[in-house]
């Protein structure tokens, strides 16, 4: 019997899921702004339904399975990725550092999981000059999708294959899963346009923005309608290079219902909706790490072999001058 929880740190909402021996015992959602202003509401929700053997914490861009006791200032910097010279003001997931610190101070049994770029299942050449192949919550979403497809189609984890599109409240992202493993990805800041975020940026636009380019820029310039729909379709099709015969396109995230019909019309694969993917996926990963029912899934993902930092593969001119705070 394992009792675990997972947290999805979204731009719009923080979602929490608790599992007891694989059964859902907690599902709560809080506005991100409210959690940023008072992380205690998140801590209280977890304490009310605890104790937990393990809590899969909010890791932003990801850490290679780091326990709470090992999280220092450098790890916090890598979670949020804010430049040393970034102007002060609201940006990204507001109060993320304070939220993580509050969870750690509450002495919860936390672990902070990897982003896609930390995983050994993605070849190094696909990581070239990339940071965001999918944040830690996208890895969690993919875990839920693997479990979901295996159950629905009555197949083994190693037989699952799909492209997951997460069309969230701000960002859109995509991950390729083949043989039950994450093999490629397009993260929210390097993929299709999102509802509130620009996605992959034209290099010339970045150059011309110059000193005006900030974290707030990445969280701006999004669009709905055809821009969101076609961008998601292009992302899914581009990842079929890495997973040539996906069984399905699985769509998660706040705006998934808005794009299901347009995607089904554009894509030559079955398109299905998956709900509450990131929070439930985080809880599934916690369960597997704690030795529960989802241990084979964690082993298949090679989660314990995650390594490095999100900065390891950046080889651009000027990268040596990157400084975080």
Residue ranges and their predicted role:
Residues 44-54, 152-156, 233-248:
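Phosphate/pyrophosphate-binding loops at sites that engage ATP/ADP/AMP, CoA/4′-phosphopantetheine
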Residues 51-130:
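Short beta-strand-loop/turn "lid" adjacent to the catalytic site in phosphate-handling enzymes
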